[in-house]
Each structure stands twice: as structure tokens, then as C-alpha cells.
């Protein structure tokens, strides 16, 4: 009877539900197996645990999934010790040194996803780490593992050698005068399609779902040009691949390589088929761009695909000859550009709508947009530089909602014998990171740190490091773009798109909360260490009569 009931229940479960159940069972087995191994960094303390523990308790690992924000906050400011398991003399001695943790110069271990443990470096080690050569601390190896590129895109090369991304900064500088006005026009078309043009009736929409399509169309103009950026079939596939990469990450990252070899192909099966369909969409463009390269025409399309193929012709000819590789590099560029921009823009709009009435945030944004960015003729680099209110709003919203989880600037240790200035002896193969989300909410750096102050950075208060802190400027207290020589090259694209989107939204549309929200902003949701916009958050829009 019991077996029959179990079989009946299993039959009703979907593919991903069955996969999740199997992975959960495997995870528990591996967790108990891991606890029998040698200690990981025995000289570093375990956040949330009593002194001298060798492994995280199940309670602390469970807390990672249910109360990660406070766990990380403790690790940033201090370490939690439990009176029930420590003598008063031990507590006094340890509390006397509590200020030594990541904010004040000492590393700490934190539970991470699945069976893993994270090595978190102190803030004081950031500049040292960012100055290390890639042969010592590698960002590309860290992100290849984090994004599970071997499975999600079929090969680790797309992040271990991410030339499709490093091209962006130089390419954008060369084409900005011609391309940015085109992006603005594309954005206007995408907003009109999804938000409508009715000036009499309010329309309710799911914010993040709508912005996915708006961002996909706008950034596809940059990445693949006008031929595909309005092709709904291509856009649908492009974002499904983005979501498929996320699914693969969730299905593989928690486990050791042996298990990943099984779960990776299973979780990415649909994604690989969709990438093949994207390749078919790209084939005509690929052949056309090859012909342009062979003819050595000077007048070439300004999109990233053309720049990628031009680079590959000179530096990676074996990749240029394979349209499947080019298609996967386009998908890698889509993943970074579309996913990050959508999350950032969603958080910004939620905070703008939820900002305190005393700030009149929308009125300030409208006034600034009217002065600097309402016509294509005005869309210049200098015009963007004058948009200090929009810049401050974007930085403040991103400060409050770190888009990459609680940790940032991951680096994989590539050789033994590497020792930080604080004396932390790093083990080869370890990935280290920093508690960026906590640093961005530090009350010593930001008065009223959890309050959205749209003008915090336009006043010049910032983090006290001199010049005004802009949306794209990185520091130890602001790491959504990373830091140092490998800071995200695509952040300048996000900067342009966010400011254009804010300008168009506030000048062309009225925005409001649905009645059932009671005028209040819905809170972000924590998924382990990821803070994400509230699922299915809705807003009301109506075209303005202007």
C-alpha cells in the first residue's frame, strides 16, 4: 500500500520536481560525508558557531537558507558565540576580539550552497587581492565555476576566456555617438509595446516580467543589431536561455564535481536545445558578417556581434569558423547583459515608486530628464554625465539591493603559497570573496543605511573617498560591478540603459502601486544569500498626456 501510494505520488510530480527531490537526498548524504573529512581552513573561525568547532552544524547550514542576512551581518561585524555552549570566561575573551572579523581585518568561514563552505576575506584584503595577477587569483575561473559554464553553455571556455565581454568597454567607446541614440529609440519602442499608449486608463503589469522583454529588445539592438532585436521568437529564446543557465546553476553548484557530471547535463538539456535554435536565428547574420569581414568594408554594423567576429578573425580564427561557438558567446553576453540589467532596473523602479513623499523623486527625475535627455539629439556622453539625480537614484537602489547575492568579487586561488597581508594562507582551488552586501549597509559609511535616499550620492556625501560616487564607480563599500582591473566592463552599458529607461518612464508614463499594496513597496525576498525583487511584483502604468 505504502509503495503504491509513493509510486502514485511520484507519477504526479513533474520533471524538475523529481530532479529537485533526488538532488535533496544526494545533498543530505554528501553533507554527512563531508563532515568526516579534514577541516577546511582550520585557523579561520566559523560564523555562527562556538569556538573550536570543526564543521558547521546543521542548524547553521539551515540558517544559511532561512536567515542568511543576519548570519552574514554577524560575520561582517563580529562572530556569534552561544552562552549555552561556552564558558563566561571564554565568551569574555572572544567578545574582546569580536571586532577582528571581516570589517576589521580577519577572515571567516561561512556556510554556502549545498555542501560547500565559503572563505570570506576581510575588507582590508580587497585592494591586495585585486592587484594580484590572474595566475595567482583568477576571476575567470571563479565565474566559470559560479555560472557552471561547462554545463550551462556546454564549455568552460565562455567564462575562462570571456573575450566577448572584455570587448564591450572598448567597443562601446567607439560606437557610443551612433549607437546610444539607436538604443534610446529601441527602448521607446519596447516600452510602447509592453506598457501601451492609452492616456485614459491605468494598466496593471508584472514589473520584472515586463522589463525582461523590454531589456531583451533594447540590449539585443546592441548585441545583434536591428535584424533580430524585434524578432519575438529570438527574444523569447534568448531569455529562456538566460533562465536556463540559472536553472543549471541551481542544479549543479551545491554539489561536488562527481554529482555535477550527472545533474549538469540533465538540468541543461532544454537550454542546449534552445541554444541550437538561437544558432539557427543567427545563421543569416553570421554569414552576412563573414562576408563583410572578407570584403574588408570600412562601414561595418556597430553591434557587438560584428565586433566579436572582427576580434575572432584576428585572435581566435578557430572559433570564428564555428558558428556554434559564436552563438554560445552571444548567449553568454546575453546572460550577463539581460539578467543583470533586468534585476537592477526592477529594483530601481520599485525604490523610486516606494521613496518617501518628502523627496518628490519622480518630479526630480522628470525635471532632470527634460533638461538633458528627451530628444535623440541630446543623447551624448556629456548629457549622461549631467544626470546626477538619476545616477544617485540608481546607485542608491543598487546599494540597498546587491544584485549578485551577499558576496562579491570572487577569485579562485590558482597556486599554493599565497598569503594575504593579514596572514591568511590561501589554499589552491579555493574561491574567496567579500561580504559586499553588508559593506553597502554599514551605518559607519552610510547614515540611515536601510533607508532609500534618492539624493544620497548627488549631494556628494558618498563613502567619503573624495570625488562624487557615481553609479559605475567601484570601491570597497560598493561592489555590484566588482573592483579593480577586472571590474565589470558592461557596467557602462547598464548605466546608459538605466538612465534612458528612467527618463522615458517618468516623462511618458504615470506610475503607481496597485490598490491592494496600500501605497507600500513590497519587500525583497531572500533565497539563501540571494536578495531578489519581490516575485510577481506589480505596478500600475498609464501613458501621460504630454
Swiss-Prot record:
GO cellular component: membrane
Pathway participation: Secondary metabolite biosynthesis
Record-listed E.C. numbers: 1.-.-.-
One Gene Ontology term from the biological process aspect of the record: secondary metabolic process
InterPro entries for the chain: Cyt_P450 (IPR001128), Cyt_P450_CS (IPR017972), Cyt_P450_E_grp-IV (IPR002403), Cyt_P450_sf (IPR036396)
Any matching Pfam family: p450
Glycan-carrying positions: 147
Known cofactor(s): heme
Keyword Transcription recorded: no
Keywords for the protein's UniProt record, in alphabetical order: Glycoprotein, Heme, Iron, Membrane, Metal-binding, Monooxygenase, Oxidoreductase, Transmembrane, Transmembrane helix
Chief location bin: membrane
PANTHER family tied to this protein: CYTOCHROME P450, P450, PUTATIVE (EUROFUNG)-RELATED
Role, per record: Cytochrome P450 monooxygenase; part of the gene cluster that mediates the biosynthesis of fumosorinone, a 2-pyridone alkaloid that acts as an inhibitor of protein tyrosine phosphatase 1B which is implicated asa negative regulator of insulin receptor signaling and a potential drug target for the treatment of type II diabetes and other associated metabolic syndromes. The polyketide-amino acid backbone of fumosorinone is first assembled by the PKS-NRPS hybrid fumoS.
Name of this protein: Cytochrome P450 monooxygenase fumoB
Organism for this UniProt entry: Cordyceps fumosorosea (strain ARSEF 2679) (Isaria fumosorosea)
Source taxonomy: Eukaryota, Fungi, Dikarya, Ascomycota, Pezizomycotina
Amino acid at each position: 500500500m505504502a509503495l503504491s501510494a509513493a509510486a502514485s505520488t511520484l507519477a504526479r510530480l513533474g520533471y524538475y520536481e523529481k530532479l529537485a527531490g533526488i538532488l535533496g537526498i544526494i545533498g543530505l548524504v554528501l553533507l554527512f560525508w563531508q563532515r568526516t573529512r579534514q577541516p577546511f581552513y582550520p585557523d579561520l573561525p566559523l560564523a555562527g558557531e562556538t569556538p573550536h568547532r570543526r564543521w558547521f552544524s546543521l542548524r547553521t547550514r539551515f540558517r544559511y537558507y532561512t536567515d542568511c542576512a543576519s548570519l552574514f551581518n554577524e560575520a561582517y561585524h563580529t562572530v556569534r558565540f552561544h552562552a549555552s555552549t561556552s564558558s563566561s570566561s571564554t565568551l569574555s575573551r572572544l567578545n574582546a576580539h569580536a571586532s577582528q572579523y571581516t570589517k576589521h581585518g580577519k577572515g571567516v568561514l561561512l556556510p554556502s550552497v549545498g555542501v560547500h563552505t565559503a572563505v570570506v576575506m576581510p575588507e582590508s584584503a580587497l585592494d591586495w587581492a585585486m592587484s594580484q595577477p590572474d595566475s595567482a587569483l583568477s576571476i575567470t575561473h571563479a565565474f566559470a565555476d559560479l555560472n557552471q559554464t561547462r554545463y550551462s553553455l556546454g564549455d568552460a571556455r565562455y567564462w575562462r576566456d570571456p573575450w566577448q565581454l572584455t570587448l564591450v568597454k572598448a567597443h562601446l567607446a567607439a560606437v557610443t555617438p551612433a549607437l546610444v541614440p539607436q538604443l534610446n529609440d529601441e527602448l521607446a519602442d519596447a516600452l510602447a509595446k509592453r506598457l501601451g499608449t492609452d492616456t485614459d486608463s491605468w494598466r496593471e503589469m508584472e514589473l520584472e516580467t515586463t522589463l525582461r522583454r523590454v531589456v531583451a529588445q533594447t540590449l539585443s539592438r546592441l548585441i545583434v543589431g536591428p535584424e533580430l532585436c524585434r524578432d519575438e521568437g529570438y527574444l523569447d529564446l534568448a531569455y529562456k536561455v538566460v533562465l536556463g543557465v540559472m536553472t543549471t546553476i541551481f542544479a549543479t553548484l551545491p554539489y561536488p564535481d562527481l554529482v555535477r557530471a550527472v545533474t549538469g547535463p540533465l538540468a541543461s538539456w532544454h537550454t542546449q536545445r534552445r541554444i541550437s535554435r538561437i544558432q539557427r536565428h543567427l545563421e543569416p547574420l553570421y554569414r552576412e558578417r563573414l562576408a563583410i569581414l572578407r570584403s574588408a568594408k570600412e562601414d561595418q554594423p556597430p553591434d557587438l556581434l560584428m565586433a566579436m567576429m572582427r576580434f575572432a578573425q584576428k585572435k581566435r580564427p578557430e572559433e570564428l569558423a564555428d558558428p556554434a561557438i559564436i552563438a554560445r558567446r552571444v548567449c553568454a553576453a546575453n546572460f550577463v547583459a539581460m539578467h543583470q540589467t533586468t534585476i537592477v532596473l526592477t529594483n530601481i523602479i520599485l525604490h523610486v515608486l516606494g521613496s518617501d513623499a518628502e523627496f518628490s523623486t519622480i518630479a526630480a527625475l522628470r525635471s532632470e530628464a527634460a533638461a538633458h535627455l528627451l530628444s535623440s539629439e541630446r543623447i551624448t556622453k556629456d548629457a549622461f554625465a549631467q544626470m546626477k539625480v538619476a545616477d544617485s537614484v540608481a546607485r542608491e537602489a543598487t546599494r540597498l539591493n546587491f544584485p549578485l547575492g551577499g558576496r562579491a568579487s570572487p577569485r579562485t586561488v590558482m597556486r599554493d603559497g599565497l598569503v594575504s597581508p593579514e596572514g591568511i594562507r590561501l589554499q589552491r582551488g579555493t574561491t574567496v570573496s567579500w561580504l559586499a552586501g553588508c559593506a553597502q549597509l554599514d551605518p559607519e559609511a552610510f547614515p540611515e543605511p536601510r533607508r532609500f535616499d534618492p539624493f544620497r550620492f548627488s549631494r556628494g556625501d558618498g563613502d567619503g573617498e573624495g570625488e562624487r560616487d557615481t553609479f559605475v564607480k567601484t570601491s570597497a563599500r560598493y561592489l555590484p560591478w566588482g573592483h579593480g582591473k577586472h571590474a565589470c566592463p558592461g557596467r557602462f552599458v547598464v548605466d546608459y540603459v538605466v538612465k534612458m529607461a528612467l527618463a522615458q518612464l517618468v516623462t511618458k508614463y504615470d506610475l503607481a502601486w496597485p490598490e491592494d499594496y496600500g501605497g507600500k513597496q513590497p519587500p525583497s525576498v531572500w533565497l539563501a544569500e540571494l536578495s531578489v525583487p519581490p516575485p510577481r511584483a506589480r505596478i500600475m502604468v498609464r501613458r501621460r498626456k504630454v
